[in-house]
Design a protein with these regions (language model features):
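Active-site-adjacent structural elements that line small-molecule/cofactor binding pockets in enzymes
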Residues: 1-173
Length: 173
């Protein structure tokens, strides 16, 4: 190859690199480069399709481009979601209103019409039902929870624990 390797050498480093793709086009580029795909809570595209549909397309295009590139390993795909299980009164106070009629949103970022994914906030059984319908979430290998750091470490740990205890097992994770 003629390439210099990174020192100190870390075997398998190339398989631990992720690219945060904000569009279907950059997801294809990531596949061609041979890096894992990280898809966030927004895409710099707005076609009229739902965020989950756009993101599912992004994942499918990534996997197709990966196959065409002929890489000799299977990449990982992560999606980010704002998910808040409501398990007590404090959760309801912080997030209860967000879950009522929450939808994707369209906005403009750096001149691009963009689609933003909705915030999931509901009691665990409702979350499981909603998340099972999120095609991109079901297509991914990993989910990253985006939570508001301004609520403090203890409350953020509560959110993560509520998700891990009440939601993830029902999704088969």
């Amino acid at each position: 190859h003629g390439r210099l390797r990174i020192e100190p050498h870390s075997p398998g480093l190339d398989r631990r690199i992720w690219w945060g793709a904000g569009s279907r086009e950059t997801a294809v580029w990531a596949a061609q480069q041979g890096v894992n795909l990280m898809s966030s809570t927004l895409l710099t595209e707005a076609t009229g399709d739902s965020f989950a549909q756009l993101q599912s397309e992004q994942i499918a295009l990534f996997r197709d481009a990966w196959k065409k590139a002929g890489h000799d390993w299977t990449p990982r795909v992560s999606v980010s979601r704002s998910i808040f299980p409501i398990v007590n009164e404090l959760d309801a106070m912080y997030f209860g209103a967000r879950g009522q009629g929450a939808n994707d949103q369209i906005g403009v970022i750096d001149g691009f019409r963009s689609t933003f994914g909705k915030t999931y906030a509901a009691e665990p059984d409702q979350l499981v039902e909603q998340l099972n319908q999120d095609t991109a979430l079901m297509d991914a290998n990993s989910v990253m929870l985006t939570i508001p750091s301004q609520l403090g470490v203890d409350y953020n740990l509560h959110i993560l624990e509520a998700f891990a205890t009440h939601v993830a097992p029902e999704l088969g994770w």
